[in-house]
């Protein structure tokens, strides 16, 4: 998912503006395991595509990029942190895939909740999801299980359209 394949100017997408119409779209921070394992890359790509189809602007599209590791190898830890936190603070909501445990994903979820940004956590039924997610009573947090790609897409679209 290279930048050249994305529609519209990067600046407009970050501001949530739809290609000259001026219409605002929800800005979503997509969160998924990177260093903890990329075995769900296909799921992250489906999540990205589903959000785009629903009219959302995915600010952290790099999570679904198969070339992410190569691109991030050229960045410092500080640059990665600044990019991700900068995008998170511009987001209307965070959607996290939490099947694969990730300290970074947990950190992003916590930062979003502290900022009162709505969070949707998604996981497969067999996942051993942290009690810090499953037991969290924060009203801004929603945790859902999905059994297949169709269910995943339905949950994501429903959440995005409700923003």
UniProtKB/Swiss-Prot annotation:
Reactions catalysed according to its record: a pyrimidine 2'-deoxyribonucleoside 5'-phosphate + H2O = a pyrimidine nucleobase + 2-deoxy-D-ribose 5-phosphate; a purine 2'-deoxyribonucleoside 5'-phosphate + H2O = a purine nucleobase + 2-deoxy-D-ribose 5-phosphate
Signal peptide: none
Keyword Hydrolase: yes
Repeat listed as a keyword: no
Domain of life: Archaea
GO biological process, alphabetically ordered: deoxyribonucleoside monophosphate catabolic process; nucleoside metabolic process; nucleotide metabolic process
GO molecular function, one term: 5-hydroxymethyl-dUMP N-hydrolase activity
Chain residues that bind substrate: 29-35, 44, 62, 108, 130-132
EC numbers: 3.2.2.-
Gene3D superfamilies found in the cross-reference section: 3.40.50.450
HAMAP family from the UniProt entry: Nuc_phosphate_hydrolase
Functional note: Catalyzes the cleavage of the N-glycosidic bond of deoxyribonucleoside 5'-monophosphates to yield deoxyribose 5-phosphate and a purine or pyrimidine base.
PANTHER family: 2'-DEOXYNUCLEOSIDE 5'-PHOSPHATE N-HYDROLASE 1 (PTHR15364:SF0)
Assembly with partners or alone: Monomer and homodimer.
Entry similarity comment: Belongs to the 2'-deoxynucleoside 5'-phosphate N-hydrolase 1 family.
Protein name: Putative 2'-deoxynucleoside 5'-phosphate N-hydrolase 1
Provenance organism: Methanosarcina acetivorans (strain ATCC 35395 / DSM 2834 / JCM 12185 / C2A)
Classification lineage: Archaea, Methanobacteriati, Methanobacteriota, Stenosarchaea group, Methanomicrobia
